Amino acid sequence: MADLSSRVNELHDLLNQYSYEYYVEDNPSVPDSEYDKLLHELIKIEEEHPEYKTVDSPTVRVGGEAQASFNKVNHDTPMLSLGNAFNEDDLRKFDQRIREQIGNVEYMCELKIDGLAVSLKYVDGYFVQGLTRGDGTTGEDITENLKTIHAIPLKMKEPLNVEVRGEAYMPRRSFLRLNEEKEKNDEQLFANPRNAAAGSLRQLDSKLTAKRKLSVFIYSVNDFTDFNARSQSEALDELNKLGFTTNKNRARVNNIDGVLEYIEKWTSQRESLPYDIDGIVIKVNDLDQQDEMGFTQKSPRWAIAYKFPAEEVVTKLLDIELSIGRTGVVTPTAILEPVKVAGTTVSRASLHNEDLIHDRDIRIGDSVVVKKAGDIIPEVVRSIPERRPEDAVTYHMPTHCPSCGHELVRIEGEVALRCINPKCQAQLVEGLIHFVSRQAMNIDGLGTKIIQQLYQSELIKDVADIFYLTEEDLLPLDRMGQKKVDNLLAAIQQAKDNSLENLLFGLGIRHLGVKASQVLAEKYETIDRLLTVTEAELVEIHDIGDKVAQSVVTYLENEDIRALIQKLKDKHVNMIYKGIKTSDIEGHPEFSGKTIVLTGKLHQMTRNEASKWLASQGAKVTSSVTKNTDVVIAGEDAGSKLTKAQSLGIEIWTEQQFVDKQNELNS
């Protein structure tokens, strides 16, 4: 047994060494086959002799048993966000504030990795817990998934108690490989590596996460007590020595001009990196100066994040195609000569509507400027008339639906053309796709191509038919083996237990979004009560305006829809609200039961963070100001909502007043 113990230790050392060379140094000394052979040997030993399996064994990287859910855990120290800078003027103002408070300063510039912020806790040198950022105060425990990332040491080189923070991300080559696999399996593709990383880390089965080949860069440590570091740069060097991966493309600079040079360098070189970045983080380098400057409620005063502007490129507009959405809206899409934008190849981009095409004088054959809105969604910004070829073609929208041939109409007050044929095949298929989507019934495995096959085979004609599908229906479909069929049927069965708001949103009632679906489900609790409501009742509810009220009542009064609901009931699809009622939340009297509207730009938190916090205190956050609104929180550049609130005599708070009230409650 002594020989076996020695071999286990040897395998640990070899596998950890090879893993570090491959994933951290990007310089492997052995082929993958050698690593796999040694890992398989260790797995076999641990299966036959469980006493040799340790918490830091390299076999942990493979993943373990699937979890039922992720636990919510409070951060020992809040994970704060950074203030943003979008241009040189913002950066110079930041520099001026710094120098006014602490005098001369050295900055540390680091690449802002486009991934998911994580916190890693080590006890006696062992990795014991990993959390997502969450809302900054509470994150999700994704320890088992993080253990599969080779760049995260399971055991530090010294037995310290420490919490480090970093950015988990998906390298571009892993992202391309993952999407190729998803395309083969007729699954929805990830839009970008960031979404792919976030989705991978939230897999309940860590074995799936292990296959995604994620990585991580560590950028900070919570407590410097055990560190011989006087600066951010020295702290990163210490983290390297302990076995953590930090980004090497960092630089110390003496002034704001050095910061601007660093930004200029990486703005031009960002595409050469094997991972996505979306900006630059600038920090005061000296740790004592950081302590002197301190924090606001939401961010450190000694750091700021410069965000890259959306990249614009020029390519050729080859054609314009039309798509019909589930509500009949006909949307033009630009077919482009493939071009790389913000790290991915783009061959299609949104043109939104006919008015935009004409207003921007966009013609087929033009050279056009393309960018990704928010570095995600490609859109055509403008044409370049001076480069227009003689044979460029002015585009005119059709008069009839390209799917069903029905005449297209433009409803008063709308810019979009719409097909109003309720039996239009394109709309019906889009409605089915919407019904199974994540925010609706969330039926995993029922992708677009499978739905199209099922519809064309006349196996499903409406959303209720999904719950009547059998193994015999699914097995003959393309790329549907026994395992995929079993998984899909299980997902369909699971969807029957969704809460009422999922069903309401999934039905695709025009104007009824996710939030309004939640409001109605919570208010009426069952579908049967909803079937009896009137427009007059609905318009009295916050967040349910005239259009939504009319649309919901008209939809639910339709006899075909009532028959559809009965068809769903016959298959035991849940029609009851399962969530927590806002009225049951015991919040602070300052907020509980109040209707609050957020307007304008917030600097110390995002609108989403503010909304979540208010909801946690029992407040109802609405999007419009009415006589029933109790408070309006007005950020920078608040517009018509603030004006309306003033005219109605509604109480108005500035962002700072709101933050002060939060601080009072937290103290």
From Swiss-Prot:
Keywords: DNA damage, DNA repair, DNA replication, Ligase, Magnesium, Manganese, Metal-binding, NAD, Zinc. NAD(+) binds at D32, S33, E34, Y35, D36, S81, L82, E110, R133, E167, K283, K307. The active site is at K112. This is DNA ligase. The gene is ligA. Disulfide bonds: none annotated. One of its GO terms (molecular function) is metal ion binding. It comes from the Bacteria. Its EC number is 6.5.1.2. NCBIfam families: dnlj (TIGR00575), PRK07956.1 (NF005932). One of its GO terms (cellular component) is cytosol. It comes from Staphylococcus aureus (strain COL). Its cofactor is Mg(2+); Mn(2+).
